[in-house]
Amino acid sequence: MKYSFIIPVYNRPDEVDELLDSLTRQTIRDFEVVVVEDGSSIPCKDVVDNYADRLSIHYYNKENSGPGQTRNYGVERANGEYMLILDSDCILPENYLKEVEAELQYKKADAFGGPDRAHESFTDVQKAINYAMTSFFTTGGIRGGKKKLDKFYPRSFNMGIRKEVYQALGGFSKMR
């Protein structure tokens, strides 16, 4: 298996549903999904179970330890060569893996990240928050969505990393 999507989640079953739905639309299917519930009081297990017939999906529920440790927990259980780490509120375009695959064939990268932008269905408030987070006038220098190979500034809501590199680096910090 080439790719493992690692999805830490805390009290977001509706967003997990949207993300998993977007994964069913991927044009490349060589992936598994690892959903790790981080001690949620509003679990997403029923949502995950609804996708068991359409995705190679694994669900884990553990005590709350924060997003970094939850990502590490997921990576430990994943089988892919590349770990694609997403936040639970991501929605991927159907060509996401196709573009990742093309870039990895062109440039052999051990780690990579992608831009973020507001989905067209977002409310005006959500779009304003997105602007504040991605504008050149705020943090756009880091999160500005440039499409070029450059220094890697990890943003854990949309990042990929070769599993062996992740393990060599020790994963995410134990800090909360």
Residue ranges, per PLM feature:
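A structural helix-start
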Residues: 9-17, 37, 41-42, 93-94
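Acidic donor-binding segment of Leloir-type glycosyltransferases
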Residues: 20-61
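Short aromatic/hydrophobic "clamp" motif used to bind/position activated sugar donors
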Residues: 83
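The conserved acidic donor/metal-binding loop of glycosyltransferases
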Residues: 87-91
